[in-house]
């Protein structure tokens, strides 16, 4: 069984209604990974990858490439890439807090912000231009969409 970026986002939306911090932390983390996978898929459709600025980690590298799009990208596409990179960077900061800084509080408000950022990433990835972001419906053999 495989999952999609949208599946992670759906889990986050459900957990948003939980009444305890551990679940908010899980939801914040999954929302980031939803955006990460959505962004990674979207980036593959660009004419050429951006400059990773020598970053080594896969997360930092993706964010850097999105923030520094290649000149082969037309202006609107480059602008969208930078927006996605900015939102993903903000989400990563919140995800690190949720996953690793257990001595810091994670609030429902922080989770709401994380979900807002995820919605912005998904919206930009689905915008006009370089195709669309990951489909919310996976294709089964024979081309029938799975709902």
Where are these regions (language model features)?
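Terminal alpha-helical segments
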Residues: 1-147
